[in-house]
Amino acid sequence: LMDSIPMVVITGQVPTTLIGTDAFQECDTVGITRSCTKHNWLVSDINDLAAVLHEAFHVARSGRPGPVVVDIPKDIQFASGTYVSPEHAPRRHKRTVRPVDRSRINEALELMARAKRPIFYTGGGVINAGPGASEALRELARATDFPVTSTLMGLGAFPASEPQWLGMLGMHGSWEANHAMHDCDVMICVGARFDDRVTGRLDAFSPHSTKIHIDIDPSSINKNVRVDVPIIGDVAYVLEEMLRVWKSKTMQVDKAALKAWWKQIDQWRAKKSLTYKPNADVIMPQYALQRLQEHIKGRDHYITTDVGQHQMWAAQFLDFEEPNRWLTSGGLGTMGYGVPAAVGVQVAHPKALTVCVSGDASFLMNMQEMTTAVQFRLPIKVMILNNKYMGMVRQWQQLLHGNRMSESYNESMPDFVKLADAFGATGIRCDKPGKLDDAIALMIKTPGPVIFDCVVATLANCFPMIPSGKAHNEMILGADITDAEVENAIGEEGKALV
């Protein structure tokens, strides 16, 4: 639900005659899933089944996408009934398409034309709105020459190779993206929801900006941050309409102010906030992903990740030129997502290179899905950044608990090469920077599923970072930071916000 995944889950239930009797394996599936789905159904009449299934797929995909559950008792599964086609099925959940307020679009465009320090803040809603939304965003950004940043879920909506791209924003975003967000005077939020990983301290979030918010979900408007110009509607349609009006009115930006704004942004870029200390003896995780980027550049490829430090480093060091090439759990942040996601991607795109960037702990959450990859001959490549820790947990224990480690060190990790062999896949291991390129090349060219155990520095921290409870302009960088500075980065109030 938090990742906006349109998923239809069909579950089994005890026969209708036993519901409510605490029968063997009875479970109140509808009650349990009510809080984490868009809607759910318990089918009690076989003649309702077809209509319910049609409606389930409609609800999952309409508006802001999300999961739904259809619970089917055992006697209903064995029964025969009348099939109803989607066109003739009664629909209880009729989506009300409210007309987009054109006056709001005009108001937004006037603000953009007068802006001195504008920025596009984009999110996963641009991806979910389809390729047309990403294309419209690109055209509108090029027409205005405004800088563009994105949330974790929105990567790929705007090309990373474009000079207007500032990188990801938020807790582990770039220096230039976060400072531009803090200092902007007009913010155009497109398909994002102002979540806590992006905003930092709310009362200090972009304090001097006029905020435009475009979103299909009315409940996202003014939920976390008060906006000045709300535009409720399909992101693709709204962006296309904004672009049409901008061109038809031959609207112009304040070029002098925009030139000064880009000069300031270039000064922030000069910080090179993703810089890290290289190591000739140990593979730094950032270096591993930089090398992966060089090997996959120009290929038809998809990246999935699990959740943790490796996820943030992948977002920082891998470049995405197109939408839907990056699949990660950035809303709920659930470990174990990467491998099954890679399996799904490979089924959908059998000829593409599919790489799952994982961590040693995350991989173990759903490693059984390697059997699926082997069984169906899906050549997914799982690149494990193995630091022998739950890295993000360890980093927070250093930040919040005086470096007192608890349950975050994985002393009894399996031999991932032998584990790959046990699954019937290919295992590769590398722990030397000088051999890393050969190992990545071997991973890519090896037929079938591969587990690549990339042994990286154990205590590397993920920077840059906005400490919890701090504002965008209070970021800390990682290149020269001391352990003492890390441990004192978060105050007492911020500790409760992690």
Residue ranges of model-derived segments:
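Thiamine diphosphate
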Residues: 10, 18-25, 134, 178, ...
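Gly/Ser/Thr-rich loops at beta-strand to alpha-helix junctions
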Residues: 124-128, 309-310, 362
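Structural motif
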Residues: 186, 302, 353-355
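Active-site diphosphate/adenylate-binding microenvironment
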Residues: 263-340, 345
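Glycine-rich, N-terminal phosphate-binding loop of Rossmann-like dinucleotide-binding domains
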Residues: 122, 190-191, 307, 358, ...
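N-terminal alpha/beta PP-like core and its mobile active-site loop of ThDP/TPP-dependent enzymes
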Residues: 1-253, 282, 291, 379-384, ...
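Short, surface-exposed connector motifs at secondary-structure boundaries
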Residues: 39, 113-120, 295-298, 323, ...
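Generic enzyme active-site microenvironment
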Residues: 69, 213, 304, 357-358
